[in-house]
Amino acid sequence: MSPWIKHICLVLVAAFMLVKTTESKKDEALYCSACMAIADEINYSISQTDPKKMIHVGGFRLKPDGSLTDKKVPLARSETYLTELLEEVCKSMSDYALYENPDTKEKSYKRFAPRDNDGGNFPDFKNFKFDGPESSSALKFACESIVEELEDDIISLFASDSDHVAKTLCSEVSDHCKSSVFQHSEL
């Protein structure tokens, strides 16, 4: 083999190894928690939307008889509304903090701030680790990365009103969570 071919092969191997090491640096607990938080926040927002509100969708084309061919879908499951929710979902990541399960010592990010209709139902704070704004900004970055990467998949999952959206999104579509996470989770 000529020396330049060996050099090119060496450069390609080095580049491949560099890509592999940077891919594996994603914090699994962080990205899994961000994915779960996205599903939880969108589910909550959908549940707070009036189910009677409908929106017209379709091309608004005229049929040969002069009538319109549009259809109504629930606002909460419309692509327009879900896109609006996705634009805002990562702002709520400041309501999450690192939580260490006292039994298993597993770490994940969980919501610590009660929602408006929770009636002041605060969680037990002794297992939360509040590391300042750095931890919530890391979760927000992970959230934004997931939303940017999987926006179309997230919208189609929530628009179809499928069961176990969190499991489907976080375990099957994005592969950020192991399926064992869902044996312990209430999502």
UniProtKB/Swiss-Prot annotation:
* Keyword Signal found: yes
Q: In Gene Ontology terms, what is a biological process of this protein?
A: determination of left/right symmetry
Q: What induces it?
A: By the fibroblast growth factor fgf8 in the MHB.
Q: What is its main location?
A: endoplasmic reticulum
**GO annotations of cellular component type:** endoplasmic reticulum
Q: Where in the cell is it found?
A: Endoplasmic reticulum
Instruction: State the disulfide connectivity.
Output: 32-177, 35-170, 90-143
- Signal sequence range: 1-24
Q: Family membership, please give it.
A: Belongs to the canopy family.
**Function text:** Involved in the maintenance of the midbrain-hindbrain boundary (MHB) organizer. Contributes to a positive-feedback loop of FGF signaling in the MHB, enabling the MHB to exert its role as an organizer for the tectal and cerebellar development.
What PANTHER family would the database entry show? CANOPY FGF SIGNALING REGULATOR 1, MIR-INTERACTING SAPOSIN-LIKE PROTEIN
Indicate what this protein is called per its UniProt record.
Answer: Protein canopy-1
Q: What lineage is on file?
A: Eukaryota, Metazoa, Chordata, Craniata, Vertebrata
Question: What gene, per UniProt, encodes this protein?
Answer: cnpy1
